[in-house]
C-alpha cells in the first residue's frame, strides 16, 4: 500500500519559526540490487606482459537485516556478493583487485568487518570504545580470506564510516595501498531506538583503527593522493561546527 511521510520545513532565511513549509513524500521500496557490488576486468600491458585488473565498485556496505535475522540462507549482503566476485576473478586469472569505495557513505559495521576478512586474516578489524570507556576489539574469525593477491582501495572525501574502517584496516595491516583523497572522517557508531511516531538515532560509541587512531574528524589519509575537484576543508566531518574531535587509544 502507498504510504507517505510529511516533512515540516523551516526555511534557512526565515525570520522566525512560524514560517514553515509542508512537503509530502511518497515512500518507495529501495531494492538492494540497485546498490549491489558490481565488477569489471581491465587488461593492462606493461613491459610486454599483460595483467588483468579486477575492479569492484561497492556503493555501500549493505545487508538485508530482516532476511539475516530470519536466518534466510539466501540473504543479500555486500560481503557475500564481493566474495562471489572474487571467486569469479580467480577463475578468470585476475592479477590484482581495486576496491572502489568512492562516495560509499558506509552501512553495516558487521559487513565492513567481514569484507576486511576476505582480504586479510591478520586479526581484528577495528576497536570500539563504548560510552563507559570499555574498549572492544572487533574481528570475525569465521571469515576466510578469499583474496591473497595484490589489492588496493580507492577512496574520496565522501567515503565514510564503514568505508573508513575497511580502508584503515587494509592500510594498517599493509595489505594494500589506499589511493585517492582524505576520507570523510565519521568515526562514531549509532543505534536506532523506536518511538511511537518514528525513531531516535543515538551516538553511543566511537570506533578506532587497529593502530589506535580514530577516524573521527581526520578520516583516512591515502598512501597515494589523487587531485580533488573540491576543497576538503568544506566537506566532511571536520567541516561541521559541532563535530567530535579526533583522539586515539
Regions found by a protein language model. Give the residues of each.
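Cleft-lining beta-strand/loop regions that shape enzyme active-site pockets
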Residues: 1-196, 206
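Short, functionally important structural connectors and interaction interfaces within domains
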Residues: 17, 117, 199-200, 216, ...
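Active-site lining segments that contact anionic ligands and/or coordinate catalytic metals
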Residues: 148, 173, 197-202, 221, ...
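Metal-dependent DNA phosphodiester-chemistry modules and their immediately adjacent helices/loops
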Residues: 159-161, 198-216, 220
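Conserved functional hotspot residues or short segments at active or partner-binding sites
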Residues: 215-249
Amino acid at each position: 500500500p502507498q504510504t507517505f511521510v510529511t516533512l515540516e520545513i523551516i526555511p534557512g532565511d526565515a525570520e522566525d519559526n512560524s514560517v514553515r513549509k509542508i512537503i509530502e513524500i511518497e515512500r518507495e521500496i529501495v531494492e538492494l540490487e540497485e546498490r549491489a557490488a558490481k565488477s569489471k576486468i581491465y587488461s593492462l600491458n606493461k613491459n610486454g606482459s599483460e595483467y588483468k585488473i579486477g575492479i569492484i565498485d561497492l556503493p555501500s556496505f549493505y545487508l538485508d537485516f530482516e532476511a539475516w535475522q530470519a536466518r534466510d540462507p539466501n540473504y543479500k549482503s555486500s560481503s557475500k556478493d564481493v566474495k562471489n566476485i572474487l571467486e569469479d576473478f580467480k577463475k578468470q586469472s585476475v592479477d590484482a583487485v581495486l576496491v572502489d569505495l568512492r562516495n560509499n557513505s558506509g552501512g553495516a559495521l558487521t559487513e565492513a568487518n567481514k569484507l576486511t576478512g576476505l582480504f586479510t586474516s591478520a586479526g581484528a578489524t577495528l576497536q570500539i570504545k563504548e560510552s563507559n570507556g570499555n574498549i572492544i576489539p572487533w574481528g570475525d574469525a569465521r571469515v576466510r580470506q578469499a583474496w591473497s593477491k595484490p589489492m588496493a582501495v580507492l577512496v574520496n572525501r565522501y567515503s565514510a564510516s564503514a568505508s573508513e574502517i575497511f580502508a584503515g584496516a587494509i592500510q594498517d595491516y599493509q595489505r594494500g595501498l589506499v589511493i585517492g583523497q582524505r576520507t570523510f572522517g565519521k568515526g562514531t557508531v549509532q543505534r536506532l531506538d523506536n518511538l511511537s511516531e518514528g525513531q531516535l538515532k543515538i551516538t553511543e560509541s566511537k570506533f578506532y583503527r587497529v593502530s589506535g587512531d580514530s577516524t573521527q574528524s581526520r578520516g583516512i589519509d591515502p598512501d597515494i593522493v589523487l587531485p580533488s575537484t573540491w576543497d576538503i576543508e568544506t566537506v566532511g566531518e571536520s567541516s561541521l561546527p559541532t563535530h567530535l574531535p579526533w583522539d586515539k587509544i
